[in-house]
């Protein structure tokens, strides 16, 4: 029987992490003068802000960015009490963590839907890690059924819901989400921290999360940082054991005050036992039980990236980076009768290269920042499947498909500044060649796509605090690997196309941060599976329309008032996502809520901090027909809305510099809520019960 390679035992990895951390601590790095900042030009952003919207100069670029954008920094992540990436992202306006896949609740997958778009494995957003696509095959399989990402290694999360299609296409109708790993320290000596957290679920079990970070920079300009994050234990379902190891080694060498080389080596492995869905009768008897104890997902990914950045002058910047990753993932799922196991091992290799150049020049009464860039991605991989008889272990039904994609993208945009206006027209052009070869039947399926994607972003800096913005962007989704072999002369598949318009306002002052955005998305030509076809047949059938409003407010009370130390925050999203084709035209898209909100308050006084928050999502439907009545298997029916409350306290130990403790409760009232999955392990999936956690961290 085929089994996936999961690497060494986690205990040995933990000892390895400690050894590397101690090795780093054994060196002394003298203080290093930080790189001189590029001078500001007539009040405009520096080139490295204009040249890379998701790169340096984050806060300045957010303030005047011409689209809806939210950034969560390290302290925001810690105060949220989030256990997983999904926990964190569901607090961001317009974002819903759907958890409606068969591996929901585990660490292996990411299920994020933006503005009513499907959230199962996050296929409609461009998900990046340090600006590099996170998906193992960004074009051929953008779904994140395997998401090699750990919350403890993340320094910030940048969620751009509109306005970024030119730089980060093509699959971004649901925006761009960039996870930035922790930066290499530039201060004197070695600095870092180690943390240990235990999560205790009111039902099921508990898990331990641990992390280590250490790094520094020498006086010759060479810097290094080691990152490790791990997890062991179980979730809130019976026999939902899980193991995660996430390593990264980052390096940077400052060649001159304006140029640098940077690189990162990474390794990730995960094993998750996934309980799957329950029938209505099983859920009523015990929503936390596991009737599929043989089901599991596993994955391994190794990656390397290297780049060169040169801020040539106040008006020029050049950057080039290349990256490589090798990944494998496997799912094992038992059939309904419990007699057969379906194994699906998949392997991927992806190589990419991205050069970019930005030039600033004056033309008439305007200042222009013109950026030209190119990206080539080469994907190779194979999808395999076979069955194993539970009683005898006999293997049968072997199938193999070999996949290849070569994607070329070129883009140009010009940020034109005149007076208080910032107008950025842009164009991205994609040329994609994809091939899928059926090894068993010796059949080849091919498709070539060429697509121009125009956009325009506009910002008006009304005052120092207030920015008005609007944008129009186009994006598209390519024909994916698993869809290629259903193509024929009578059923030619073409890319999905989306057009997005949004407008809004952003306020930023010492005490108040606020943003209001309205949006409209027309998403046409969606590739949909024809119901009742086995194997699945795909056609260009789907059309949906999404519109809504997103509101965000963060207020810090005056330091001289009676409420000094207090701050309050809130966000609210209303989304209407409707099907516009077929028999269910006019009905809601499945697995999204029309309304979501988060409301909370923070208090900080000396070493003590307190955070109280609540999140809410409205009802959902699990099928296109918006069926309210529940089916016996639990896969179909209304999904009621729910509200949960969370509380956290944090404390910095006096006299023990660098030591702090976080403790809290998620789902304070132990609200019972659920979603559904229509995957092969279909049924009802209970949400997390009341969860207590405590974390200790020592920073040096």
Which sequence ranges carry the predicted segments?
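Face-selective signature of the C-terminal outer-membrane beta-barrel domain
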Residues: 254, 258-262, 266, 298-439, ...
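C-terminal beta-signal and adjacent terminal beta-strands/loops
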Residues: 2-4, 619-625, 651-700
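Surface-exposed extracellular loop regions of Gram-negative outer-membrane beta-barrel proteins
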Residues: 271-285, 378-389, 433-436, 446, ...
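Transmembrane beta-barrel wall of Gram-negative outer-membrane proteins
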Residues: 204-232, 236-274, 296-311, 454
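Membrane-embedded beta-barrel scaffold of Gram-negative outer-membrane proteins
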Residues: 194, 211-214, 307-311, 317-333, ...
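Short acidic/polar hinge/loop motifs at secondary-structure boundaries
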Residues: 132-161
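Gram-negative outer-membrane beta-barrel transporters
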Residues: 357, 364, 417, 423, ...
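Extracytoplasmic beta-strand/coil segments of soluble accessory domains associated
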Residues: 86, 90-133
């Amino acid at each position: 029987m085929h089994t996936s390679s999961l690497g060494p035992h986690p205990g040995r990895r933990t000892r390895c992490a400690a050894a590397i951390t101690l090795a780093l601590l054994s060196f002394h790095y003298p203080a290093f003068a930080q790189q001189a900042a590029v001078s500001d030009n007539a009040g405009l952003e520096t080139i490295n802000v204009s040249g890379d919207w998701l790169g340096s100069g984050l806060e300045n670029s957010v303030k005047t960015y011409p689209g809806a954008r939210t950034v969560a920094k390290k302290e925001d992540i810690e105060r949220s009490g989030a256990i997983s990436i999904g926990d964190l992202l569901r607090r961001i306006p317009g974002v819903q963590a759907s958890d409606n896949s068969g591996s929901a609740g585990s660490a292996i997958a990411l299920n994020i839907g933006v503005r009513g778009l499907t959230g199962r494995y996050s296929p409609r957003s461009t998900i990046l890690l340090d600006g590099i696509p996170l998906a193992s095959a960004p074009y051929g399989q953008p779904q994140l059924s395997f998401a090699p990402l750990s919350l403890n290694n993340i320094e910030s999360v940048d969620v751009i819901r509109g306005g970024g299609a030119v730089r980060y296409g093509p699959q971004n109708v649901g925006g761009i989400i960039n996870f930035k790993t922790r930066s290499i320290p530039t201060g004197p000596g070695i600095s870092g921290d180690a943390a240990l957290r235990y999560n205790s679920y009111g039902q099921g079990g508990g898990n331990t999360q641990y992390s280590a970070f250490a790094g520094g920079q020498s006086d010759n300009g060479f810097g290094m940082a080691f990152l490790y994050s791990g997890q062991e234990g179980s979730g809130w379902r019976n026999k939902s054991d899980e193991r995660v190891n996430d390593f990264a080694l980052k390096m940077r060498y400052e060649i001159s005050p304006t140029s640098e080389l940077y690189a990162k080596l990474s390794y990730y492995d995960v094993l998750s036992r996934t309980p799957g869905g329950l029938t209505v009768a099983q859920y009523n008897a015990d929503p936390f039980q596991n009737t599929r104890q043989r089901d599991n997902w596993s994955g391994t990914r190794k990656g390397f990236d290297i780049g060169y950045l040169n801020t040539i002058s106040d008006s020029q910047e050049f950057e080039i980076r290349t990256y490589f990753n090798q990944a494998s993932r496997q799912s094992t799922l038992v059939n309904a009768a419990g007699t057969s196991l379906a194994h699906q091992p998949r392997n991927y290799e992806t190589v990419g290269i991205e050069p970019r150049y930005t030039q600033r020049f004056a033309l008439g009464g305007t200042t222009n920042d013109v950026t030209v860039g190119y990206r080539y991605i080469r994907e190779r991989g194979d999808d395999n499947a076979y069955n194993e008889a539970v009683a005898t272990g006999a293997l049968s039904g072997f199938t193999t498909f070999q996949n290849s994609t070569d994607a070329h993208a070129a883009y140009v945009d010009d940020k034109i500044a005149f007076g208080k206006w910032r107008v950025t027209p842009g164009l991205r052009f994609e040329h994609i060649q994809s091939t899928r070869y059926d090894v068993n039947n010796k059949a080849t399926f091919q498709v070539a796509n060429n697509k121009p994607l125009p956009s325009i972003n506009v910002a008006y800096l009304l005052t120092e605090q207030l920015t008005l913005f609007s944008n129009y962007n186009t994006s598209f989704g390519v024909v994916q690997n698993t869809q290629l072999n259903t193509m024929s002369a009578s059923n030619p598949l073409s890319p999905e196309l989306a057009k997005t318009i949004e407008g809004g306002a952003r306020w930023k002052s010492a005490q108040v941060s606020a943003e209001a955005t309205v949006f409209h998305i027309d998403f046409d030509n969606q590739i949909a599976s024809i119901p009742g076809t086995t194997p699945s047949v795909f056609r260009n059938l789907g059309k949906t329309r999404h519109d809504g409003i997103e509101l965000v407010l963060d207020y810090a009370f005056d330091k001289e008032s009676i409420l000094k130390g207090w701050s309050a925050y809130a966000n609210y999203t209303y989304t209407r996502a409707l099907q516009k084709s077929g028999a269910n035209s006019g009905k809601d898209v499945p697995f999204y809520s029309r309304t979501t909100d988060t409301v909370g308050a923070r208090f900080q006084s000396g070493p003590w901090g307190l955070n109280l928050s609540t999140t809410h999502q409205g009802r959902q439907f699990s099928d296109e027909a918006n069926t309210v009545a529940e089916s016996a298997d639990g896969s179909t029916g209304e999904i009621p809305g729910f509200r949960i409350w969370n509380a956290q306290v944090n404390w910095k130990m006096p006299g023990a510099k660098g030591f702090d403790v976080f403790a809290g409760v998620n789902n304070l009232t132990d609200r019972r809520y659920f979603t559904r999955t229509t995957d092969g392990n279909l049924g009802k999936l209970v949400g997390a019960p009341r969860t207590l956690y405590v974390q200790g961290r020592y920073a040096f």
